[in-house]
């Protein structure tokens, strides 16, 4: 069976893994180890000439191309937000698809086979729109998303794969670049992983810490120099890199230096930023962000009907959990030491790879029981939200409830599907609406309308409404304003393919340019050394062809460059013959000279030859 890879599609960095021979293996990016370890930085960039850069190449040029570089777009998944770059608009799904395409390509190179399927992780607190947007991104990238797995659940799988047989209640504290998830899991002795509860915040993460650092550094510089660096996009990008680097370094040391020479300039000349930055300063800046995690921990423990004392293990997931202040906060608040034998940056993609292996049948002793993070319901009379599937219900799940009309002879009902915890419909997220019409005239309260909510293993919802009197039925697979239509997906797939074909064209252009440039150099050198050995007419033709080739290189038309290169090759044939003959004469003279000198010719004759030899043990008879 074809391999299914596991992907952690992250806000700051993404990662991929596969299970082979019973072990999970990290799939490296083509660029190797970077600031984010072996991961794929979640950066997409468009250069001024329209070239697409993804991952580490995009991150590396962010300082010099801030307007063309985009990251942290995961925070906008499931919204109508559009990113504008070089006059074009891109949805978060498209940008995520570029990352997934890069992962797909590098995975295929690493594994040596075509990859068409993936398990992708999402924050546990992602709503239906955000989950559907993630599946759409996979489709654009040419990947069938066979399962969406909540990130904390994936981390638990990675932790527990070699601990099946032990009953444990695990609190997964997942603080990533852009989101917070707290999940309580019960690991059964038989290999079951059941999610008891989940809570979180999709707008809380390491990016908020970076922003706090950037503001602090910018304010400090402003006090000294009277210049606000936040008004300069290139300076902000340099600050962003410096803040992230300092945050990472201060997880291991107590003090670091931030040095940004030539950060800006004014009438007095260039300005340099140099400051010492301590762990204590960092912790004071981010403490209020870390404290915001408290409510989600308490909510998850409460929903699981547990107390902090009954939690067996704490697993820390996500880059920011490497920070001592975050580790201490989680351990102090729960009253347990965190599990150290798991890499917070890699465990989510490892867990996704485990789930992929479960789906292919390579792993048979694990059963994953996940939950829906938010309550699902519909709007009823008076604008009230009536719930059908409560939050933290194990998925897949199916619930039905009978409703009726609110007015006499009402011919139709509108089903407004809601997601959220608020009592009033208007305060929750509307996932979609549909009409059930053709209801026969009857007094209010008499018709029986059965509404069924069916949520699949990916957490994606299907809703149907049936008039039990007539048997008439309508259904909807949630298609809110933020979900991409099939046409949208097809369009974006073509755009993604277009970028891939443009890369091929660009590579071809570079190769042709290099060939032409090398030929021009070679012909010019030969003309300088041996030009007097060809006729004036032949020399003129060569010089004209050289000029034409140089002019062609000034443009970008590959066909013109190819044609000029071929013309120069033809024109320089006579010159090549002269050079070849001169070389032969030189070799003949050298051979004659060598014969008169004895032993040195022996060395010259053998130079460049390979002689196979056998090692002989002289002591052996």
From Swiss-Prot:
Keywords: ATP-binding, Chaperone, Nucleotide-binding, Phosphoprotein, Stress response
Residue ranges with Basic and acidic residues bias: 606-621
Induction: By stress conditions e.g. heat shock.
UniProt similarity note: Belongs to the heat shock protein 70 family.
This protein's record includes keyword Cell division: no
InterPro entries, sorted: ATPase_NBD, Chaperone_DnaK, Heat_shock_70_CS, HSP70_C_sf, HSP70_peptide-bd_sf, Hsp_70_fam
Keyword Nucleotide-binding on entry: yes
Function: Acts as a chaperone.
Residues annotated with Phosphothreonine modification: 179
This protein's name: Chaperone protein DnaK
Region described as Disordered: spans on this chain: 583-621
UniProt xrefs under PROSITE patterns: HSP70_1, HSP70_2, HSP70_3
SUPFAM superfamilies hit by this protein: Actin-like ATPase domain (SSF53067), Heat shock protein 70kD (HSP70), C-terminal subdomain (SSF100934), Heat shock protein 70kD (HSP70), peptide-binding domain (SSF100920)
Polar residues bias spans: 583-605
NCBIfam families given in the database record: PRK00290.1, prok_dnaK
GO molecular-function term, one example from the UniProt record: ATP-dependent protein folding chaperone
HAMAP family: DnaK (MF_00332)
């Amino acid at each position: 069976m074809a391999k299914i890879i596991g992907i952690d599609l992250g806000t700051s960095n993404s990662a991929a893994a596969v299970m082979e021979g019973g072990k999970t293996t990290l799939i490296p990016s083509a660029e190797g180890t970077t600031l984010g370890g072996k991961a794929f930085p979640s950066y997409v960039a468009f250069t001024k000439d329209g070239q697409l850069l993804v991952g580490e190449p995009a991150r590396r040029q962010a300082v010099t191309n801030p307007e063309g570089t985009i990251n942290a777009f995961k925070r906008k998944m499931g919204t109508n937000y559009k990113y504008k770059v070089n006059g074009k608009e891109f949805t978060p799904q498209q940008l995520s698809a570029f990352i997934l395409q890069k992962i797909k390509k590098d995975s295929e190179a690493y594994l040596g086979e075509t990859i068409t399927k993936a398990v992708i992780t999402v924050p546990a607190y992602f709503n239906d729109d955000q989950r559907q947007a993630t599946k759409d991104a996979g489709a654009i990238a040419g990947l069938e998303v066979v399962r969406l797995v909540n990130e904390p659940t994936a981390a638990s799988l990675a932790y527990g794969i070699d601990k099946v047989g032990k009953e444990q209640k695990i609190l997964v504290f997942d603080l990533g670049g852009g989101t917070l998830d707290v999940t309580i899991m019960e690991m059964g002795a038989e290999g079951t992983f059941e999610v008891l509860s989940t809570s979180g915040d999709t707008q809380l993460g390491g990016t908020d810490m970076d922003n706090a650092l950037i503001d602090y550094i910018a304010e400090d510089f402003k006090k000294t120099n009277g210049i606000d660096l936040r008004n300069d996009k290139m300076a902000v990008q340099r600050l962003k890199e410096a803040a992230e680097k300092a945050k990472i370094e201060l997880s291991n040391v107590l003090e670091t230096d931030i040095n940004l020479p030539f950060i800006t300039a004014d009438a007095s000349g260039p300005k340099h930023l140099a400051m010492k930055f301590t762990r204590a300063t960092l912790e004071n800046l981010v403490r209020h962000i870390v404290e915001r995690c408290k409510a989600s921990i308490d909510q998850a423990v409460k929903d699981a009907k547990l107390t902090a004392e009954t939690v067996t293990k704490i697993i820390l997931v996500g880059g920011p959990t490497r920070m001592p202040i975050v580790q201490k906060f989680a351990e102090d608040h729960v009253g347990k030491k965190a599990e150290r034998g798991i890499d917070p940056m890699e465990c989510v993609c490892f867990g996704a790879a485990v789930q992929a292996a479960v789906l292919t049948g390579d792993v048979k002793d694990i059963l994953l029981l996940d939950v829906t993070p938010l309550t699902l319901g519909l709007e009823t009379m008076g604008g009230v939200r009536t719930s059908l599937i409560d939050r933290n219900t194990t998925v897949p799940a199916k619930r039905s409830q009978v409703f009726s009309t609110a007015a006499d002879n009402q011919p139709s009902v509108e089903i407004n599907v809601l997601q959220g915890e608020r009592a009033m419909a208007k305060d929750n997220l509307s996932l979609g609406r549909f009409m059930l019409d053709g209801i026969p005239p009857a007094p209010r309260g008499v018709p029986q309308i059965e509404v069924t909510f069916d949520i699949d293993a990916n957490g994606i919802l299907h809703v149907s409404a049936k008039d039990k009197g007539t048997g008439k039925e309508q259904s909807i697979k949630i298609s809110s304003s933020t979900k991409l239509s099939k046409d949208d997906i097809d369009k974006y797939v073509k755009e993604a393919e277009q970028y891939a074909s443009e890369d091929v064209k660009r590579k071809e252009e570079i190769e042709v340019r290099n060939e032409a440039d090398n030929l021009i150099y070679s012909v010019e050198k030969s003309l300088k050394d041996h030009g007097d050995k060809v006729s004036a007419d032949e020399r003129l033709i060569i010089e004209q062809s050289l000029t034409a080739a140089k002019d062609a290189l000034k443009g970008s038309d590959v066909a013109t460059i190819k044609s000029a290169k071929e013309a120069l090759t033809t024109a320089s044939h006579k010159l090549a013959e002269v050079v070849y003959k001169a070389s032969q004469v030189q070799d003949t003279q050298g051979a004659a000279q060598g014969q008169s000198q004895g032993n040195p010719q022996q060395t010259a004759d053998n130079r460049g030859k390979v002689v196979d030899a056998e090692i002989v043990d002289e002591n052996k008879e």
